[in-house]
Regions:
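FIC/Doc superfamily catalytic core
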Residues: 1-156, 160-277
C-alpha cells in the first residue's frame, strides 16, 4: 500500500508538471534507486529523476509530521526537499525553500496571475488557516487547495507542494486522501480555473480522485484502515469565493518593484529541513 502510494503519487504529480518518466521508471527508481530509458527515449532529464526521488523523500518527511499543525516553515521545507539537487536550486533567484521574490503566472491556467511576491506572506496566513480548519467536506477541501494554488507562493513546484499538503491535511483529520491523476489533468486545471465562479468542477474532480484512491485502499488494505469520507454537498455556496490577495491586473510597480529590479523587501521565509529528508 505504501509503495503503491509512493509510486502513483510521485509519477502523477511530477508528470502533471512535465516530467518525462513513465510509471514503470518511477517504480524502478523507488524500488532499486536506478532506472533505464524507455523504448524510444534517447535520454532521461536529470532533473526529472532527481525530482521524482525527492518526491519520495518529501512524502516520507510529510508523513513523519502528519499530525503537526501546518505552518510556513513546514511548507517551505517541503519545497526545499522537492527541489534539492536540481538545476533550479543553483540559481539564487529561484529562492528554493523560500517564498518567491518575483511575480509569476500559472502556465497551465492560461497564464493566469497569482498573488504578488510582496503579498505572499499575508496570503499564506489565509492558506494555512484554511488547511488548519479543514473538514471532511467537499467544498472545504477544494477551497483550501484552490487558495494555495492561486497564491502560488513559490517560483516553481507549487502544484506538487499543494498536493502533498492536501494529502497531509486529509490524513491529519482521518479523512480519505487522494492522488490526482495526470490523465485527469485537464479536468483538474479547469476546476482550479473555474472554482471562483463554478466550484463544482473542482469539487467533483477531487471527489472522483478520492473514490479512486479509496478503491485502492479497500483492495490492498481491506478492513485495516479507518477513515471518513463525506461526498455530499448542496451545491450552494453562501459566501463569495475569492483569494483576497490576488490581483487580476498588474502594473509596472507590481512587476519590477520600487527599485525597478524586481526585488522584494525583507528576508524570505525559509524552511527548516533538518531531520529525515
Amino acid at each position: 500500500m505504501f509503495e503503491t502510494t509512493q509510486v502513483l503519487f510521485a509519477f502523477n504529480s511530477n508528470h502533471m508538471e512535465g516530467s518525462t518518466l513513465s510509471v514503470e521508471q518511477t517504480s524502478d527508481l523507488y524500488t532499486t534507486g536506478s532506472m533505464s530509458p524507455a523504448d524510444g527515449m534517447d535520454a532521461i532529464r536529470l532533473d526529472d529523476a532527481i525530482e521524482t526521488r525527492n518526491h519520495f523523500h518529501a512524502f516520507n518527511w510529510m508523513l513523519d509530521r502528519v499530525d503537526r499543525p501546518v505552518d510556513d516553515a513546514m511548507i517551505c521545507s517541503m519545497h526545499a526537499i522537492l527541489k534539492r539537487g536540481t538545476s533550479q536550486e543553483q540559481d539564487p533567484d529561484n529562492n528554493v525553500g523560500a517564498y518567491k521574490a518575483r511575480p509569476n503566472v500559472i502556465g497551465g491556467l492560461l497564464q493566469e496571475h497569482t498573488v504578488l511576491a510582496a503579498d505572499v506572506p499575508a496570503a499564506m496566513r489565509e492558506v494555512i488557516a484554511a488547511h488548519r480548519e479543514l473538514k471532511d467536506d467537499p467544498f472545504s477541501i477544494a477551497f483550501a487547495h484552490w487558495l494555495f494554488e492561486t497564491t502560488h507562493p513559490f517560483f516553481d513546484g507549487n502544484g506538487r507542494v499543494g498536493r502533498l499538503l492536501l494529502f497531509k491535511e486529509l490524513l491529519r483529520i482521518d479523512a480519505m486522501p487522494m492522488v490526482i491523476q495526470d490523465r485527469n489533468r485537464g479536468l483538474y486545471v479547469r476546476g482550479l480555473r473555474e472554482f471562483g465562479r463554478t466550484p463544482g468542477y473542482l469539487i467533483d474532480t477531487l471527489l472522483a480522485e478520492r473514490d479512486v484512491y479509496r478503491g485502492i485502499v479497500e483492495t490492498m488494505a481491506p478492513d485495516r484502515t479507518s477513515y471518513t469520507y463525506h461526498d455530499a454537498w448542496d451545491g450552494v455556496v453562501a459566501r463569495r469565493i475569492e483569494n483576497p490577495y490576488l490581483k487580476h491586473a498588474w502594473d509596472e510597480l507590481d512587476i519590477f518593484g520600487a527599485c525597478g529590479d524586481g526585488a522584494v523587501p525583507g528576508p524570505p521565509m525559509r524552511g527548516d529541513v533538518r531531520g529525515r529528508a
